[in-house]
C-alpha cells in the first residue's frame, strides 16, 4: 500500500514504515502528525485518485528528527570584470516516519 501526499509544496510517494525527508515542520520530535492533503492511494489492486484531493484520505506520521542538509555553494562570476561572489546555504529539513495510511 502506498500514497502520494503533499507537504511543503512538494509531492511525496510513501509506504508504511518508510522514513521521508520533508521541508522543515514546526512540530516537536516524537510528535505524531497527520497529512490530509492526500492526492492518491493504492492498496495493490485498486487505485484511488483525488480531484485534486481524496476526501477522508490521511497519512499518519511521527517526527523523528530535525536537521540541516549539506552545504551548497552559490557562485556568481563575471568574466573579465574582476567580479566573484560566493555564498553558502544549508536547508532545514524534518525526517518523518510514516505510521499509517488511511483511505
Curated annotation (Swiss-Prot):
Superkingdom per UniProt: Bacteria
Entry-linked SUPFAM superfamilies: L21p-like
Record keyword rRNA-binding present: yes
GO terms for biological process, alphabetical: translation
Key words of the record: Ribonucleoprotein, Ribosomal protein, RNA-binding, rRNA-binding
NCBIfam families tied to this protein: L21
Gene source species: Hamiltonella defensa subsp. Acyrthosiphon pisum (strain 5AT)
Name of this chain's protein: Large ribosomal subunit protein bL21
GO molecular function: rRNA binding; structural constituent of ribosome
Subunit structure: Part of the 50S ribosomal subunit. Contacts protein L20.
Taxonomic classification: Bacteria, Pseudomonadati, Pseudomonadota, Gammaproteobacteria, Enterobacterales
Family, similarity comment: Belongs to the bacterial ribosomal protein bL21 family.
Amino acid at each position: 500500500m502506498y500514497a502520494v501526499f503533499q507537504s511543503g509544496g512538494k509531492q511525496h510517494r510513501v509506504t508504511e514504515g518508510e522514513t521521508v525527508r520533508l521541508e522543515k515542520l514546526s512540530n516537536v520530535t516524537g510528535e505524531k502528525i497527520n497529512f490530509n492533503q492526500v492526492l492518491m492511494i493504492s492498496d495493490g489492486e485498486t487505485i484511488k485518485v483525488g480531484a485534486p484531493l481524496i476526501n477522508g484520505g490521511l497519512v499518519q506520521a511521527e517526527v523523528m528528527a530535525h536537521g540541516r542538509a549539506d552545504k551548497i555553494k552559490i557562485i556568481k562570476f563575471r568574466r573579465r570584470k574582476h567580479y566573484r561572489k560566493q555564498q553558502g546555504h544549508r536547508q532545514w529539513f524534518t525526517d518523518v516516519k510514516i505510521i499509517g495510511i488511511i483511505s
